[in-house]
Curated annotation (Swiss-Prot):
GO molecular function terms listed in the Swiss-Prot or TrEMBL record: copper ion binding
Record-annotated disulphide pairs: none
Main location: cytoplasm
Alphabetized InterPro entries for the sequence: CutC-like (IPR005627), CutC-like_dom_sf (IPR036822)
Signal peptide bounds: none
Gene Ontology CC: cytoplasm
Name of the protein: PF03932 family protein CutC
Annotated compartments: Cytoplasm
HAMAP family, per database record: CutC
Record keywords: Cytoplasm
Length: 248
């Protein structure tokens, strides 16, 4: 199977850079420092107008755990309807029980809303209690792929688990490695695990055009983020990653 590179895009501009670099598809997210949250309808619409490659949108109403209230599930269902109406090809979500298991009721509601779309179970998988059992549940539910770091802080650290999951999957579901994937380790991961799907942001920082600055003021309060630069996917880095994967 051909190698696939999914770019975690934080904006419509990053989506355009991903396509220019030759990415297979993008996952469009807001709130990347929080692990990704659902982007605005405006961001989705602009992204869709800019690129032709598939766009998968994360359906995650907030940061934190993956146990959701009935109100949050209702909002997620609504977001899936918006994503579909804007012509996106797929959605990315995952709901867990308080015990770290597969939340049958919550996931079933979202799956029903997303019927006919591409379905990715996101890194909620990495904090589940029993990953091999969870994988079988995802296969039975009809997910097309699972995004995972191998239940480790980074995909490189979880490469043995990723390889084991890939062997268990036997082609029934795609195993897509994500978290900390860089130009310097993507080939190692591919050769060690045997997987063919990779997820990376491949971003660089673009300096702010602001000339007047108050660097001591942070919009995140006590959370210090550089307010005078913004990360954006680099088409050149994407192209390099694609070349590496095609050479394997």
């Amino acid at each position: 199977m051909a190698m696939q590179l999914e770019i975690c895009a934080n904006s419509a501009a990053s989506c355009r850079q991903a396509e220019l670099g030759g990415a297979t598809r993008v996952e469009l997210c807001a709130g990347i420092p929080e692990g990704g949250t659902t982007p605005s309808a405006g961001e989705m619409a602009v992204a869709r107008s800019l690129i032709a490659i598939p766009i998968h949108v994360i359906i995650r109403p907030r940061a934190g755990d993956f146990v959701y209230s009935s109100e949050e599930i209702e909002a997620m269902c609504y977001d899936i309807r918006v994503v579909r109406s804007l012509g996106m090809e797929g959605v990315v979500f995952g709901c867990l029980t308080p015990e770290g298991g597969y939340d049958e009721e919550a996931n079933s509601r979202l799956l029903k809303e997303a019927q006919g779309m591409q379905l990715t179970f996101h890194r909620a998988f990495d904090v589940c209690a029993a990953p091999f059992e969870m994988l079988e549940k995802l296969i039975a539910a009809g997910f097309h792929r699972v995004l995972t770091s191998g239940c480790a802080p980074t995909a490189l650290e979880g490469k043995d688990m990723i390889g084991a999951l890939n062997k268990q999957a036997t082609g029934r579901i795609g195993i897509m490695a994500g978290c900390g994937i860089r130009l310097g380790n993507i080939e190692t991961l591919a050769r060690h695990t045997g997987i063919t799907q990779f997820h990376s942001s491949l971003r660089h920082d673009i300096p702010s055009s602001m000339r007047f600055r108050r660097p001591e003021v942070s919009m995140g309060g006590t959370v210090k983020i550089d307010e005078y630069s913004r990360p954006e996917t680099s088409a050149d880095m994407v192209r390099q990653a694609v070349d590496i994967l095609q050479g394997i």
